[in-house]
Structure formats: C-alpha cells, structure tokens
Regions:
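Glycine-centered loop/turn positions within well-structured domains
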Residues: 84, 96, 133
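Gly/Gly-Pro-rich "capping" loops immediately C-terminal to redox-active cysteine motifs
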Residues: 9-15, 75, 79, 91, ...
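The canonical Cys-X-X-Cys-His
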Residues: 78-93, 150-154
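Short basic alpha-helical hairpin corresponding to helix-turn-helix/winged-helix-like nucleic-acid-binding
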Residues: 51-80, 93-96, 105-107
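Periplasmic c-type cytochrome electron-transfer domains
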Residues: 1-70, 142-151
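C-terminal capping alpha-helices of c-type cytochrome domains
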Residues: 122-134, 139-163
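Short, charged/polar micro-motifs that form catalytic or ligand-binding hotspots
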Residues: 2, 114, 137-140
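Conserved beta-strand positions that form and line the central face of beta-propeller blades
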Residues: 11, 67, 111, 134-137
Length: 163
C-alpha cells in the first residue's frame, strides 16, 4: 500500500507572495511591484530631520548630537575612515592642507581650528550628510554610524589644533 502524500511546509513550494515583476490581476495596472506609501522608511535606514538649507544647517549646528556611545576601537575605525574620505582635502591633522590642496587641485579648504567657523558635531555631521560649498555629500559612502565616527574624529582634530 502507498503512504499518504504529504508536503512538508507547502508554502515553501507554493509561495504566498507574488514575484516582483509578475503580472498581478488585483491592481488595475497589473503590476506586483508597488511604490511605497508616502512617509515610509526602508528597513535599516533612519530619518534625518534636518533640511539641506542654511536654516537646516544652523538648526543641526545647535541641536544635533551623536546618538552612539563610542568605544576605543571606534577611534581606530574613525581615523581610517577620515584618512580615506577626508584627509585627501582636509589633511591628516585637519589643518586644510591635504594632498589635493598642496598640489593646488582644490583651493580654500579651511582648517578645523578656524575660529570664524565654530563647527560643532551637529554642523559637521550635517555637512558630511549633505555637503557644503565645494565639498560633496558623503551620505552614500558612509553609513550613519560611520558618519558619526568621522564627526567625532573631526571634533578631536579640532580640539588638537586649538591647543
């Protein structure tokens, strides 16, 4: 006699979801891939609430602070990230004398110790996120924690230059 023909976990063989680009007769346009609802945030991302304006910059400068508590190992990672992404223009010590400045490829990169700039953690993070003047955004190259690591490293360089 034959044994009953059971399927173990049948939903693995017959998925409940639709293939992303398959035809779907539920919607009028017959597409399964839908545009996300307005206001949704992709998993793994966080909302950055400051706009790319002078007012947003000033607000970030006053209000924004690092949400992460950093440990000693983070300092080494921060230095590495700074060297790769920032040091070429801003220099190893943050004095605005990176290799591109020395070779006159980019001019006018200010020192972190310039008293007229009065940078804060919030303003530094905002500039890394959006860019400012001739500096482009690094939001695609650095994730949120890495941006904060670089921000803290910049603030350390600023304090070292101010001594």
């Amino acid at each position: 006699m034959g044994e009953p023909n059971y399927e173990y976990m049948p939903n693995m063989y017959e998925p409940l979801s639709y293939e992303a680009y398959s035809e779907n007769f539920i919607y009028d346009d017959n597409l399964s891939a839908r545009i996300p609802v307005k206001g949704t945030i992709p998993r793994g991302y966080s909302l950055y609430e400051y706009e790319d304006t002078n007012e947003g910059y000033d607000l970030a400068k006053k209000e924004l602070s690092n949400p992460f508590s950093l440990v000693e190992e983070d300092f080494l990672k921060a230095k590495e990230l700074y060297t790769v992404h920032c040091g070429i223009c801003h220099g190893a010590k943050g004095a605005g004398q990176g290799i591109l400045v020395k070779r006159e490829k980019i001019l006018g990169v200010p020192s972190y110790a310039d008293p007229g700039r009065a940078i804060t953690s919030g303003s530094t993070y905002h500039v890394i996120y959006y860019g400012k003047n001739s500096m482009g955004s690094y939001a695609n190259q650095l994730n949120e924690k890495e941006r904060w690591l670089v921000t803290d490293y910049v603030m350390k360089l600023k304090s070292d230059l101010s001594k």
